[in-house]
Every structure is written in structure tokens, then in C-alpha cells.
Amino acid sequence: YGLVMWSHASGWIPSMFSGDRKDVNESKKRSFGLDNGKNTSAVSSGNQMNIDDMADALLEQGGCDFMLFDACFMQSIEIAYELRNATKHVIASPAEIPGPGAQYATMLPAMFKRDAYADEMVAAYYNQYSQAGNPYGIVVSSVNTAALPSFSAYMKNLVAIHAEKLFALESRPLLNYYRYEEWGKNNPDYFDMQSVMRQILNNEEFAEWMQEASKVIKLKTAGYWYSNHVKDVIRVDESQCCGVSMFVPRSVYDGQTGHEYNEMFINTSWAHSVWADGSNSQK
């Protein structure tokens, strides 16, 4: 069976409304949803569910075939890795999603496919917002969680080799789904993984990374998405886009009370598996 989760979301970071951000020891929690008991998406406060709690609850019930997050910022490598044992596929966007969300009447046939349902769901979501003249656009992808253990081992080696380049990352040219320094401190930068790898790897290494990523990620993009932060569309350079975001520790996050994203990141399962002791930003 599959699980569809629609609401607001903050990706892998703690809720902006919770006390977890004030206590780094509790900052391992990632959050989804805003539940204030009202049947509306026009809310800015309420209870949120942590991604690790979500994974535990699903595992208790035997897991599911797919999870569709009809919510912003939920396709990150940190989230997919947290859910790797709870679902076979994560379908989501690394960016802001269109306000109307998915058109479930047209997506249901894809959800009930016996095979290739994840690819079909990505295509169905994409088809809703890819027509010429559509004001919203979309970046949507699926992650095959069965491939994540080998991909994380591969990424661990890359991070170890290129740690110095990662910590000196030039952020301005990157495909960024949330611009921390321009849009506010409620979220860190959400860099597209492919954009980051393209900057730090040589041509041969990048070609190999693309091969490895293709075993994990399937992408569809209209070439742009509408951002409520800038009230305009943001164009996507598809050579920079795989449709999955990643966090990179940076000194810009240091000393930001309530927004200690480097410390929060250290407590994610992805950081434990891939970044080891190198997850602290260089000063």
C-alpha cells in the first residue's frame, strides 16, 4: 500500500515552532505537517510530526510501497535516508510545490500500478504542471530507497575525498531550493545534490556520480517552479538538477540561536552514515 502526506513541511529540520531548535541535543528531529485541528492549509502553527517518528510508526505496521509527500521541501537525501527501511519509494519535491497540489483524480491510476508505480506517479504529477503557460511549474522526483545503502557508501567516500571543497563551496552558482541568506532563517540552504557534485567533482568523477545517482533517483521537471518567497518563477538549469536536495555544513549557520543547522545535521542518520566526523563546518 501507499501513503500520501499533504500539508506544509520544513524538510529534515526541526519545527520552527518547537523548542527543539533551542536545544541542540534534541535537534535530531525532522518535521512534517501543521495540524491545528482545522481542515485548511492556510495555517502557520500547529503540531508537527518528526520524520524519525514517522519512520518508526510505519515500520511497526510493516512499512509501505510508496510515500507521496504533497508538501514543500520533502525530497531531500536526509529524509529519504531516514525513511529507507519504512518505504520502497519516496515521491516528493525538493522545492516549493504548487499551491493546488496534486490532482489526485489523474494520479490515482498511477498509484494502483503493480509495477513502475513510482515513475508513473512522478510523471503524473509532472504532467499536471508542465504544459506551456502553466504558472506554477514543478520539480518532482522519486527515490528508490533500496539503493540508498550502496549510494550512501559511495557518497561517504566522495565526502571524505572532497571535504575541503565541500566546506569551501561557492553557493551562489548552485541550484538552491531555499536561499537562507535571502529568504530568512526558517530553513537552511537546500542545494540540489547534482549541482553540488558538479561543482566539486572533475568530469570523470561527475560522470560516475551521475551513473550512481541514476540508480536511486528519477526526475521530472518543467524547468521552473513558482516560489512564494520571491513571488515569481525560478528557472531550473537541468544540468544542475537531479531533484533531490542535500545539506552542506557551512560556517554561515554558526552562532545563529535557534537555527544551529550544522549541529542539527550531525544528528541525522545521513550524517552518521556519510559525513562521519567531518560534518562540522570549517571556521
Q: What is the predicted role of each segment?
A:
Residues Y1-N25:
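Low-complexity, highly charged intrinsically disordered N-terminal segments
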